[in-house]
A protein has these predicted regions:
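A beta-strand edge to alpha-helix "cap/lid" segment located at domain peripheries
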Residues: 1-24, 34-121
């Protein structure tokens, strides 16, 4: 898996955001994945909880952009961590640190861990 292919996984996720459908986003996550979201204090542990988070997050009209990516691969596992910025429909923006951990399931790459936290400054 090349760095470009891992970067494309973020583009796929960001495109799913643009659909406005939380179910489409949740399908990119393993059923037992963990989401530590940007704009919520609640850790999400499954598709139902992940959909619930994105249902609220999508109401803001987010568009993501990676500012810095650090990609590493370990066989069936790939990690993309760095900084991204979400711009919202109302013109506001939030910069956050992120980590996506992907696992190859034999057919496609799935998100198994996603941690996103607003920059402290």
């Amino acid at each position: 898996m090349s760095e470009n292919e891992i970067t494309a996984l973020f583009d796929l996720w960001n495109s799913a955001l643009q659909t406005g459908d939380p179910k489409k986003i949740a399908l990119l996550y393993e059923t037992n994945s963990i989401l530590i979201p940007t704009m919520s204090n609640k850790v999400r542990h499954n598709h139902e909880e992940i959909e619930d988070y994105f249902d609220h997050f999508l109401a803001k009209g987010p568009v993501g952009r990676i500012d810095e990516a650090n990609i590493r691969t370990f066989g069936q596992i790939a990690i993309n961590s760095g900084i991204y910025t979400f711009t919202f429909r109302n013109g506001s923006a939030v910069q956050a640190r992120f980590t996506f951990v992907y696992r190859w399931n034999g057919e496609c790459w799935m998100i198994v861990e996603h941690h996103s936290s607003k920059m402290p400054e």
